[in-house]
Amino acid sequence: MPYQQITVNVNDAVAERLADALMEHGALSAAIEDACAGTQNEQAIFGEPGMPTEQIWQQSKVIALFGEHDEAAAVIDAAAQECGLKDLAYTGETIENQDWVRLTQSQFDPIRISDRLWITPSWHEAPEGCAVNLRLDPGLAFGTGSHPTTRLCLKWLDTQLKNGESVLDYGCGSGILTIAALKLGAGSAVGVDIDEQAVRSGRDNAEQNNVDAQFFLPDSLPQGQFDVVVANILANPLRMLGEMLAARTKQGGRIVLSGLLDEQAEELGGIYSQWFDLDPAETDEGWARLSGVKR
């Protein structure tokens, strides 16, 4: 069954209201994208909980999907009227039904982290049979290895982790770093996340990779310290969790922090230098990683 896809260009003041109104009046879905994406006017936005940052592009486009026989024009008129918009211009096209699973799978290829470390979706053959291959499929939890912060943490584990060390992955998402630590020689690895879906995803991914990783919600994490603590989260949580993460790190143990932007590294380094001797920040595409040894 084909679908009708409608695109409306609007400004940031009404984009969210229009998307909500389209859904209320019968659209199957409504998404907001940067109307200038792919041009020199593309606007990069990084959202972070608790931080005052603009979340909608100044020039946005609302993309709505309708069934083949839905009265899309009537829905658009009703939504526009609700938002106080007159003579709302839009474009439409027909989207043929597809094997969406196969289409999605085709968009995810194996990711090379280093000569010996790859992230490989389950439907792909391992590109390097002798390498460490993390079997990971895109899902609801963050962390497929494509993001610079995940790569930065994986590269640290690949080059710095020592055999037999214990690892805490705080803010584990999909469990990719927890699983990688075990495959790279950790003696034990524990993942923690505030999202129950992430905990379930981590357990499923660990089973797929045949590793004995443990995953917990924060309140369920057993007491104890670790040789290595990794936290690939955002700057604001890192600010608040510093004392706790330091307490979870053994004396002489090491910490790895990412999820922060280049310009946030100096500030975060100042906070964590209370407990750690930090190395210079490593960066990748505007994102940074801090690491160091607990005094």
Curated annotation (Swiss-Prot):
Keywords assigned by UniProt?
Cytoplasm, Methyltransferase, S-adenosyl-L-methionine, Transferase
Q: What EC number(s) is this enzyme filed under?
A: 2.1.1.-
Binding-site residues, S-adenosyl-L-methionine: T150, G171, D193, N232
Q: Which GO terms describe its cellular component?
A: cytosol
Please give the chief subcellular localization of this protein.
cytoplasm
Places the protein is found: Cytoplasm
Task: Identify one Pfam family in the record.
Answer: PrmA
Q: Which reaction does it catalyse?
A: L-lysyl-[protein] + 3 S-adenosyl-L-methionine = N(6),N(6),N(6)-trimethyl-L-lysyl-[protein] + 3 S-adenosyl-L-homocysteine + 3 H(+)
GO terms, biological process:
methylation
The molecular function terms of the Gene Ontology recorded here are:
protein-lysine N-methyltransferase activity
Q: Which family does the entry's similarity section mention?
A: Belongs to the methyltransferase superfamily. PrmA family.
- Quote the function comment for this protein: Methylates ribosomal protein L11.
Designated name of the protein: Ribosomal protein L11 methyltransferase
Source organism phylogeny: Bacteria, Pseudomonadati, Pseudomonadota, Betaproteobacteria, Neisseriales
> Per UniProt, what is the name of the gene that codes for the protein in this document?
prmA
